Amino acid sequence: MTYSVFIAGLVAGATLNLLLLRTILAPPFRIWPAPEPGSWQSLTFWSLFRGGMMLTLVVAALDWDSVHLLDRSRFIGVPLFLVGFGIAICGYFNLGLGNTYCGSDGLVRHGLYRFSRNPQYTASIVGLFGLALAANSGLTISLAAMMAVAYVLMAYAEEGWLSQLYGKPYRDYCRQTARFLDVAGILALLDRKKPSRQAG
């Protein structure tokens, strides 16, 4: 059963990634952002994406600790999984439901979007990395890597669409904000929040 679920996840992830690559390399074909709810693109994308993510979780449970690649240090994966997907959920609240599902509810630059143009994707990749570490399973590592690639391709696939939709404000935002993570900006913010030391 484990291998059947793994093969299904592999097919879903590989198909999704090939369609995303075609979106990037061969416009006007577009699987993501999906043109409209109910379209074949939307149904195909969400079936493959949700299926790939769900099957990755199922394989992690079925194949848990099967290869003993790592020692107890792998349990750092659990907090990475929780924090990663917790931040991704926060990103949905910043972005709004409409924008999350390919709407045009306005360009979002506040909250997590000050530090990343794709905070949900970035955090989800961290969560997948945590899942792969914690599961200690070669099959889970393969599927998690496949879905992490999907998140990267999704970020690239939507940039042309967003540029066309929002024009110069989006292009300015791209120049000011990292695609995945503005490490320097985060460090600067943390530094500003440190209490100043006064000579006494």
Describe each model-derived feature in a short phrase.
Residues 1-109, 127-200:
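Membrane-anchoring alpha-helices and their flanking helix-loop junctions
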Residues 110, 114-122:
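Histidine-centered phosphotransfer motif of kinases
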